[in-house]
Amino acid sequence: MKKIKHWWIGAGVALATAGASQIAAAQSNVSLYGVVDVYVAAQKALGKERAWNVSPGGMATSFWGIGGREDLGNGYAAVFALEAFFQPNNGGTGRFAGDTFFGRNAYVGLSTPAGAFLLGRNTTPYYVSALRFNPFSTSFAFSPVLNHMYKGVSGQGLAGDNGWNNSLLYTTPGGSDWQASLIYGTGNKAGAQGQNQWGGNAIYAHGPFSATVAYQQVRYDKTPGDLNAQIAGFSLQSAVMAAVGYDFSVVKITALYQYLHDGIDSGDLNTHSGQIGASVPIGNGALLASWMYAKSHGRGDPIRSTWSVGYDYRLSKRTDLYAAYMQDRATGYSSGNTAGVGMRMAF
C-alpha cells in the first residue's frame, strides 16, 4: 500500500511542472512529454441546464511539451520548454477557443547552483502550491479548490490565468526540505498597470508533514486586454494562501486557507475561503474527498460551497482510470453538479 499511496498527487504536481524537470537533468537532452485525459460526464454548471459530454481534462488538462537542456559545465545549464494544451475529445488546440498556443509554459532560461531563472510564459508559484495541497490536484473538472480559484463566480475567483506572460521566474535549488519561487510579470508597454504583477511561494516538506504559503498581486487597467473582467472598475487583486498536509499512511489530510482582496471602484470585495481534503489508499488506487467554502464581504456578500468525492485507480505507472462526483452551490445560482468517469495517460 505504501508503494502506491498518494501517487496521483505527486504525479499531478510533476505534470504541472513537467518542463522544470529538464532543469534537474544531469546531461544535455531534448524530450517530448505530456498527458492525455478524456472523461464522459453528466454536467450541470451553476445556473445552467444539464448536458451529457465527452470532455477533455477530467483529472488533468491534456497537453504536450518539448523540453531541453544543454549542460554548460560547473553546475550551469541552458534550459527551455514549449508546452501546449489540446482537447483530445475533438482534436482542438488550447483549453478553449482563442487560447494561446503554448499556453502552459513557454520559456528559456538558466539553471545555476543558486537556482533556476526562466524568461517567458511561466506557471505561477501560487498555482503550484494549490495543486500540492488538494487531493484532486490538477483536476479543473472535480477539484473544489481549482473551481473556486480559477472558475470563480460573483467575483470570488483569482484574476487572470495560472500562467503569466512576459514573466521572470526564479526557483531555489532542489535537494532540501524547502523550495521557494518568485515570479514577476511586465505589462510590456509604458504605463501599463500589468507591469506590477508579482508573486511567490515557499513549500516545506519533511517526512509526513508539509506546508506552504503563497502570495500574488495583479494589477490591470480598468478595461484590460488580458483579463476577462466581469466587474467594471477592477484594478487590483491581492491573494494569499496558507496550507498544511499530513500523511498518516492510512489517510493524507490537507487543509487550505485563502484570502482575496479585490480593489474595485464601486466598492472593494474581500473573500475568505477554506478547504479540507483527504486521500485514502484503497486497493491499487485511492478514495479522494474535498470540501471548500467561500464567503465574501461586499457586493451582496456571496457564498459558495463545493464538495467532491472520487476514486482514482492506477493501471500502471503512467495510466489511471477515475470516477468522481462534484456538488456546487453559490449565491444567486441554481446548484450545479458533475458526475463522470475517465482515463488519463502520461507520456
Task: Give the ranges of each region predicted by the language model.
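Outer membrane beta-barrel
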Residues: 27-43, 51-186, 194-196, 203-210
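Outer-membrane beta-barrel architecture
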Residues: 65-67, 107-109, 169-171, 201-203, ...
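N-terminal signal peptide c-region/cleavage motif recognized by signal peptidases
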Residues: 19-21
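Repeated loop/turn-to-beta-strand initiation elements of outer-membrane beta-barrel proteins
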Residues: 76-78, 114-117, 177-180, 208-213, ...
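Detector for outer-membrane/organellar transmembrane beta-barrel domains
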Residues: 198-308
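Gram-negative outer-membrane beta-barrel proteins
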Residues: 40-48, 86-92, 125-129, 188-190, ...
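Solvent-exposed loop/turn segments connecting transmembrane beta-strands
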Residues: 158-165, 186-196, 264-270, 297-304, ...
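Outer-membrane beta-barrel "beta-signal"
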Residues: 335-347
